[in-house]
Amino acid sequence: MKVIFLQDVKGKGKKGEVKEVPTGYAQNFLLKKNLAKEATTQAIGELKGKQKSEEKAQAEILAQAQELKTQLESETTRVQFIEKVGPDGRTFGSITAKKIAEELQKQYGIKIDKRHIDLDHTIRAIGKVEVPVKLHKQVSSQIKLDIKEA
């Protein structure tokens, strides 16, 4: 019996796959537990339509990430931080991913989730720094920071 998997089933198939499985297994397990549905021509047509719309949405998200990358990498986009500095040249407060995301939003209107900013450790020194940011699975960029003394 041909079925369309509605969820991942270990050892059998992934969500959205159309596969031939034993009839008893399909009727007694997959269909009853709503893990799959019978692969009729109508159901396969619906699946293809859903896959096309998902691909279109993914392409749109990728295009937005590419646009955001060009915005971030332009010469004019440099996030300014003015921090108090101690006698040893280190800032009193540290600059975190959350702070970078907030300043980017405030200064340029670019909204990025703080979890996408790949900051190994907090920044505590003054100067110019480039911080990597992951915008999409296929798109990554750099945020330029300019940390100055107050």
From Swiss-Prot:
Give GO MF terms, alphabetically: rRNA binding; structural constituent of ribosome
Q: Name one GO biological process term.
A: translation
- Tell me if rRNA-binding is a UniProt keyword of this record: yes
Organism's domain of life? Bacteria
Looking up PROSITE patterns in the UniProt record yields: RIBOSOMAL_L9
This protein's record includes keyword Ligase: no
Swiss-Prot/TrEMBL keywords: Ribonucleoprotein, Ribosomal protein, RNA-binding, rRNA-binding
Among Pfam families, the record links this protein to: Ribosomal_L9_C (PF03948), Ribosomal_L9_N (PF01281)
Give me the Gene Ontology terms describing cellular component.
ribonucleoprotein complex; ribosome
Q: Which family does it belong to?
A: Belongs to the bacterial ribosomal protein bL9 family.
Give the protein's function. Answer: Binds to the 23S rRNA.
Q: What is this protein called?
A: Large ribosomal subunit protein bL9
Q: Which organism is it from?
A: Streptococcus agalactiae serotype Ia (strain ATCC 27591 / A909 / CDC SS700)
> What is the gene name?
rplI
